[in-house]
UniProtKB/Swiss-Prot annotation:
It is found in: Magnetosome membrane; Cell inner membrane. Belongs to the LemA family. Keywords: Biomineralization, Cell inner membrane, Cell membrane, Magnetosome, Membrane, Transmembrane, Transmembrane helix. This is Magnetosome protein MamQ. Residues 1-46 are cytoplasmic. It comes from the Bacteria. Pfam families: LemA. It comes from Magnetospirillum gryphiswaldense (strain DSM 6361 / JCM 21280 / NBRC 15271 / MSR-1).
Length: 272
């Protein structure tokens, strides 16, 4: 029994020594192969997403600036085009005003000349041939509608032309003028002139309103924040409006112009 106990104790010692050696070996191996845990790296997904968002934002910003710049150009050119149309209407009025007034006044002077000479000859004929065929015919025509019927009625005019040679020659020249200008009516001519002038002024007012509306749209666009900085950098400036002056720029017929526009009257005065 003593031998068996000694053997058992020796076996236990051997096992304990073996366990100690195994632990020492594990510790040595652990010191030799130390496992270092590396810090976790941020994944590439969030970085790429942030980069994509930044690029898209930059592209959208540049695109917006370019579109706004093009809008400025479009509005500015539209305002300039309507300004040009307004100035064309002003120039058209200036060009037509004098000619239109001259034509109307000459028309009236022609009518005045025709009826003035006709009236003079009528008086001379009536005084020279009272009770005769010419005087009776003229008095009858006056009762029926005046000398206008004489000039408009070819039969009556020819009858009087054959009745008196002197009066016939003068009246023949007047009838030739009437045949050349068959619708000499100064009242209608003046009415047409006034209608034309009013129409021109209405067109000018319409063009001025169109330009001012276009200029207002452009001015508001370049003065709104933050686009006023873009307009300042790119050189876009405000467009001035057209305002009607108190006195107006409409041409007026002065006494000097009225006298200059009556060449027939001047020629008659120079002859007299």
């Amino acid at each position: 029994m003593a031998v068996s106990d000694a053997d058992a104790s020796s076996v236990d010692k051997v096992e304990s020594i073996t366990l100690q050696r195994v632990k020492q070996s594990e510790e040595l191996l652990a010191q030799l192969y130390v496992v270092e845990e590396s810090p976790r790296r941020m994944g590439r997904g969030p970085v790429q997403l942030m980069l994509a968002i930044s690029v898209l934002s930059l592209v959208a910003f540049i695109t917006t600036l370019l579109m706004r710049y093009n809008a400025f150009v479009t509005m500015y050119e539209d305002a300039q085009a309507k300004r040009s149309n307004f100035e064309v209407m002003i120039q058209r009025r200036d060009n037509l005003f004098g000619n239109l007034v001259k034509l109307t006044l000459n028309h009236a002077a022609l009518e005045h000349s025709i009826f003035s000479h006709t009236s003079d000859k009528r008086k001379e004929s009536v005084e020279a041939g009272k009770g005769g065929p010419i005087g009776s015919a003229i008095e009858q025509l006056m009762k029926q509608g005046g000398i206008g019927k004489l000039l408009g009625d070819g039969g009556a005019g020819k009858a009087l032309l054959g009745a008196d040679g002197g009066f016939g020659n003068a009246l023949g020249r007047l009838m030739a003028i009437v045949e050349q200008y068959p619708t000499v009516q100064s009242a209608d001519t003046y009415k047409h002139m006034m209608t034309s002038l009013v129409d021109m002024e209405d067109r000018i007012a319409s063009k001025r309103e169109e330009f001012n509306a276009s200029a207002a749209t452009y001015n508001v666009a370049i003065t709104k924040w933050p686009w006023d900085y873009l307009a300042m950098i790119t050189g876009f400036k405000r467009v001035e409006y057209f305002h009607e002056k108190p006195a107006g720029d409409t041409p007026i017929i002065t006494p000097q112009i009225f006298q200059e526009l009556l060449p027939l009257t001047h020629s008659q005065e120079s002859k007299n």
